[in-house]
């Protein structure tokens, strides 16, 4: 019989399988590959499949103790990218058994853990993942989701309004609470801790939580509306994070916040479970995302990070603005906004959606538009994001020449005017400025 043959052999002999028919239970990945000069695309694609599943650089004796055909990742298709020299989209199918149930952490460790430093590749970007229902059903997903949140807040038929409290660092807890009160009293639904506000010497978390709670209840009593402030529970350890979330719940706060990329998926999923069990909404900030998703040819596209978050759990997530101070292309942004909100998203390459994604009945996430937007953007934002979104104006509220509360009033008036104009069938794109001008009289 054929004995064990030591040595190094081409990956493509084992891991490039163009005849493979993908299974409904496979996790599928689309990678944008830039091979090193002289490396054939098939070999590069196979190397990606191998290194992110069962392969290693040499044939090993222990391969004989398992069934590689059952467990290996397979590169089943490669297509050149139009308009790019030496760039390909490689499609890889992973058997479900390679992944631990309910662990976004393990999913990313497997798929993007090692292979991005691979010598045969000049660059690699994970463009999209297809998460099969067989896997997504092992996740609880968002603690509450869009519909439940609307019912808890009793707010329907319009986007929600938020505001990040600025200056983000340096305010005392008392002054911070005052700014929160003014914004909520003026008509916002939410105010927000900045992502870098954790527990610093000038404002410890406990003091902030107490003064913010006071602001919440005061503004709630005066306006007759449910109000919230995203209390940032992000901390240096999971235990400390949980302590902060528990304290927020004890104060009667409706929502807490987490920086899910710097905090990590494991911490995030623990927090999401706690929020679900205890009726807290969970606002997610994506600090550090651009480190991973900014380069077109290397890293992970934000739509992949967004899918990971929907599985791990969050009720809101920052998703770019299309119009503000930070990058974002409209169609592509709307693509991952739909991946966050909808049940079923059809494959559409023009929107960056490489696979049809069926979330079955996993709750949706509110996309949050935040960063450099102000009241004149309101018509565009209402049109682009629709009702199921949170629009956040930090400087666009607190920068109002008359102060915080008038800034909040301006945003609420503009939003209500845009929603009404849209419902009356007016064209927001064309008449936007005029609608805002009328409303401000």
Swiss-Prot record:
Reaction(s) catalysed (UniProt annotation): 2 (2R)-3-phosphoglycerate + 2 H(+) = D-ribulose 1,5-bisphosphate + CO2 + H2O; D-ribulose 1,5-bisphosphate + O2 = 2-phosphoglycolate + (2R)-3-phosphoglycerate + 2 H(+)
Major subcellular location class: plastid
Modification type N6-carboxylysine: residues: 192
SUPFAM superfamilies: RuBisCo, C-terminal domain, RuBisCO, large subunit, small (N-terminal) domain
This protein's UniProt keywords: Calvin cycle, Carbon dioxide fixation, Chloroplast, Disulfide bond, Lyase, Magnesium, Metal-binding, Methylation, Monooxygenase, Oxidoreductase, Photorespiration, Photosynthesis, Plastid
CDD domains per UniProt: RuBisCO_large_I (cd08212)
Positions of Mg(2+) binding: 192, 194-195
Cofactor: Mg(2+)
Designated name of the protein: Ribulose bisphosphate carboxylase large chain
Organism: Pellaea rotundifolia (Button fern)
